[in-house]
């Protein structure tokens, strides 16, 4: 699973995901992509699960790029613990995904195969997504 090698701080503020993505909104590597439509936090496990769904459906042909990285430590407190006494310990890593952000890209495969692979990946993610191509959204290639 993806996680940073080292960070400046062990814990981070929860924060909010305001506005749209400033960068990473266009296809840079592949011919097809999966774009986020709503703001949400995506965990490293969810990213890995979606990646596996894509690579398994493509049967190792073509190339897959992951355009998001889980760099936010999410801390939780144990069950049935009283309020106070500090923040919990970091449990997992997540990526803040803004609307318009390209999350995955694929190249070297036919349109229908890429579309089905991204449908399978989207089912693994907690976020509404849209399939896009070099020419535009929806798959008019």
Swiss-Prot record:
What molecular function does GO assign, one term?
Answer: rRNA binding
**Keywords for this entry?**
Ribonucleoprotein, Ribosomal protein, RNA-binding, rRNA-binding, tRNA-binding
- Annotated Pfam families: Ribosomal_L16 (PF00252)
SUPFAM superfamilies named in the record: Ribosomal protein L16p/L10e
Q: Kindly list the GO CC terms recorded for this protein.
A: cytosolic large ribosomal subunit
Q: Which domain of life is it from?
A: Bacteria
Signal sequence span per UniProt?
none
Asked if the Swiss-Prot or TrEMBL record annotates the protein with the keyword Ribosomal protein, the reply is: yes
Summary of the function given for this chain in its UniProt record: Binds 23S rRNA and is also seen to make contacts with the A and possibly P site tRNAs.
What quaternary arrangement does the UniProt entry report?
A: Part of the 50S ribosomal subunit.
Q: Which family does it belong to?
A: Belongs to the universal ribosomal protein uL16 family.
Q: What is this protein called?
A: Large ribosomal subunit protein uL16
Source organism of this protein record: Rhodospirillum centenum (strain ATCC 51521 / SW)
- Gene for this chain: rplP
């Amino acid at each position: 699973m993806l996680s940073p090698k080292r960070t400046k701080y062990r814990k981070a503020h929860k924060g909010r995901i305001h506005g749209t993505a400033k960068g990473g909104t266009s296809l840079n590597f592949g011919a097809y992509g999966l774009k986020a439509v709503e703001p949400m936090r995506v965990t490293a496990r969810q990213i890995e699960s979606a990646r596996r769904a894509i690579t398994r459906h493509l049967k190792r042909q073509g190339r897959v790029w992951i355009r998001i990285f889980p760099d936010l430590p999410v801390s939780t407190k144990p069950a049935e613990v009283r309020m106070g006494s500090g923040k919990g310990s970091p449990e997992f890593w997540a990526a803040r995904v803004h609307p318009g952000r390209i999350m995955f890209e694929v190249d070297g495969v036919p349109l229908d195969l890429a579309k089905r692979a991204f449908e399978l990946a989207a089912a693994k993610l907690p976020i509404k997504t849209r399939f896009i191509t070099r020419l535009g959204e929806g798959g008019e290639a």
